[in-house]
Design a protein with these regions (language model features):
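C-terminal beta-strand-loop-alpha-helix "lid" module of Rossmann-like NAD(P)-dependent dehydrogenases
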Residues: 1-267
Length: 267
């Protein structure tokens, strides 16, 4: 009986340590959420502004032959895969890699330590990924697309729906899809629309990469906080159950000792 109570006491101590760890990680994630979601919203707004510029010129005759809106001759696809830098974020990383399996013939470009580990390639950290990193990638991708090295450029990332809901998604970057409601601008562009498109498309690919990295990081932080909240609740429930079991075992041991004492005194 004594050994049983000792085992229960050790288990309670172990689970309690886990509870402290999950609470600490949850607090760290909570402290990052506002900054991460603010960065996500700003990157969304900037991307929309760049897309508006492209949509305003892309329907012009000068842009009809642009390689960026033509279907590539190559059937090869290059896909950026954005995952987290760390684990303990629920199904965040697993959902990304599950979606990536749907493109077995693609060449993957990882962003985020876990993505680099998965594809066994060097990868920048998602949390510190910025504009300079994105524009370097964008220029490299555009050159490859223009040369016909691949016909599709895409990105696998996570969409932020709410604090409780994040969804893995695939977005095609190139060829650029002209929106159905896109209208030719009444503005006169100098020197012409084709030159504007050439400049804007680099900014588009750059800002789309930045937006998806920022949004994915916000999802990672939210998923980690949710996972830590859930783990914390499970740990608290386990501690309650173990404490109840411990008290019962201890009470049983005391009762047994009293019974033995009474029996001994009667003899």
């Amino acid at each position: 009986m004594a050994s049983n109570t000792k085992q229960l006491r050790n288990r309670i101590k172990s689970v309690n340590s886990t509870l402290h760890l999950t609470k600490a990680m949850g607090l760290v994630a909570s402290s990052k959420i506002k900054k991460a979601t603010d960065a996500m919203l700003k990157s969304r707004q900037y991307l929309e502004a760049v897309e508006d510029v492209i949509d305003s010129v892309i329907s012009s005759p000068e842009c009809k032959k642009s390689p960026y809106i033509q279907e590539g001759k190559s059937k090869k696809a290059k896909i950026i895969v954005i995952a987290g830098d760390r684990g303990l974020a629920g199904g965040y990383n697993a959902n990304i890699f599950r979606l990536a399996k749907e493109y077995p013939d693609a060449e993957f470009i990882p962003i985020g330590k876990r993505s680099g580990d998965r594809f066994e390639k060097d990868a920048p950290y998602a949390e510190g990924f910025g504009y300079e990193d994105a524009i370097t990638l964008a220029k490299e991708f555009l050159q490859g697309f223009e040369k016909g090295e691949y016909g599709t450029l895409g990105i696998i990332s996570t969409k932020y729906v709410s604090m409780l809901t994040q969804e893995a998604q695939y977005t095609e970057i190139l060829p650029y899809k002209v929106k159905e409601n896109a209208k030719k601008a009444s503005t006169v562009f100098e020197p012409n629309e084709a030159v504007i498109l050439e400049s804007a498309i680099t900014e588009y690919v750059t800002s789309l990469i930045v937006k998806n990295v920022k949004e994915s990081f916000a999802c990672e932080v939210a998923a980690r906080r949710n996972a830590m909240d859930s783990a914390g609740k499970n740990a608290e429930e386990m501690i309650d159950n173990l404490s109840l079991e411990y008290n019962r075992a201890r009470q049983g041991a005391i009762t047994q000792e009293l019974t033995e004492i009474v029996a001994g005194s009667g003899a």
